[in-house]
């Protein structure tokens, strides 16, 4: 951490909390798959919170903070997607970190410190009944986002200016083909095989695009949900968009190694819990069979995207840390592909390239 950054953070902390604010310590936090950087600043001074999280924007710039593939805005955003979504989520009652100050041109945001305990960390070692309780809390918060958020639709919120459509689904499928297969060291895949995969993927994309959309977080998983004061708080929401409601639910119950604790019986209970509460508040209730089919298609599509993404991070971005999650993701894909007649034909095609599917 350079001295000029420390000076800038001190300056902004004083602007937010008063001239007598000082920083007792400043610690870099482990990053995620993005180019954002985070620090925890322990504060001292009258009226200050004990600590804050400093978000440093990429290269200290005010460039839009969202996924690189999500460039589907009709016009360039006038503000950071994070700030735009933060304002909207606050109004509908989603628990997100408080924003203490924003200096976009200098690349600094000061946020409430929600601690270090993600939902995934909180449920480790717990009995199944308590795991069920925590994931129900996560579903309750998700339903606020999806139902209240969709009902309060505001076209100035950028999440309503973009949706998971055929183009975006196929972008993610092609990302898998490119980095999960073609560019992956030691893998050879024929042109005819990739063409056949794209036909099957296009059918899935059309099916998902035809589903009624609602507001989705887009990365609603156990590492983006923080446990704070016995409640679940939501972070990393800047890529929110319109998608089938099952997309975020599939993210919650199927990400990385989540199914090592969300076993089939627990998954079934949580699916029933979600569906019952969604149908209570939705204008268009779901038929259970249709709901489950779309849930599985969403889980399959997302896991294929994740495999491609994790190989991309390793091959292109030199971030190999996410590769450890690929085997468990592929094993889950094998199980889910076999649960639907329209996707089980993918199993032998992918088993040629992933030993976990054999």
Q: What do these predicted ranges mean?
A:
Residues 35-42, 53-54, 202-249, 260-261:
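Active-site acidic catalytic loop and adjacent metal/ATP-binding pocket
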Residues 1-22:
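Juxta-kinase regulatory segment immediately upstream of eukaryotic protein kinase catalytic domains
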Residues 177-184, 245-284, 297-317, 329-337:
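Active-site activation/catalytic loop segments of kinase-like enzymes and analogous catalytic loops
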């Amino acid at each position: 951490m350079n001295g000029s950054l420390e000076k800038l953070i001190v300056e902004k902390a004083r602007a937010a909390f008063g001239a007598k604010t000082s920083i007792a310590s400043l610690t870099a936090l482990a990053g995620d798959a993005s180019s954002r950087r985070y620090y925890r600043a322990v504060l001292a001074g009258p009226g200050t919170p004990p600590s804050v999280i400093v978000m440093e924007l990429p290269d200290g710039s005010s460039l839009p903070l969202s996924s690189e593939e999500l460039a589907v805005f009709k016009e360039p955003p006038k503000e950071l997607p994070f700030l735009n979504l933060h304002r909207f989520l606050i109004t509908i009652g989603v628990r997100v970190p408080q924003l203490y100050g924003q200096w976009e041109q200098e690349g600094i945001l000061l946020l409430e410190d929600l601690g270090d305990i993600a939902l995934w960390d909180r449920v480790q070692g717990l009995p199944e009944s308590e795991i069920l309780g925590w994931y129900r809390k996560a579903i309750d918060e998700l339903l606020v986002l999806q139902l209240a958020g969709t009902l309060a639709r505001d076209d100035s919120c950028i999440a309503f200016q973009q949706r998971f459509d055929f183009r975006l689904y196929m972008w993610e499928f092609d990302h898998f083909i490119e980095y999960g297969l073609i560019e992956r060291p030691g893998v050879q895949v024929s042109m005819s095989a990739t063409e056949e995969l794209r036909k099957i993927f296009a059918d899935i994309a059309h099916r998902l695009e035809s589903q009624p959309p609602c507001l989705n977080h887009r990365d609603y998983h156990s590492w983006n949900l923080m446990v704070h004061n016995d409640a679940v708080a939501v972070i990393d929401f800047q890529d929110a968009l319109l998608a089938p409601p099952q997309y975020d639910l599939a993210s919650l119950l199927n990400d990385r190694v989540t199914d090592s604790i969300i076993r089939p019986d627990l998954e079934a209970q949580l699916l029933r819990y979600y569906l019952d509460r969604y149908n209570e508040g939705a204008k268009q209730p779901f038929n259970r069979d249709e709901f489950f089919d779309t849930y599985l298609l969403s889980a399959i599509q997302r896991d294929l995207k994740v495999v491609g993404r994790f190989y991309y991070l390793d091959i292109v971005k030199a971030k190999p840390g996410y590769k450890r999650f690929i085997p468990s993701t592929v094993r889950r894909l094998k199980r889910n592909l076999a649960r639907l007649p329209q996707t089980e034909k993918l199993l032998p095609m992918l088993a040629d390239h992933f030993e976990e599917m054999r």
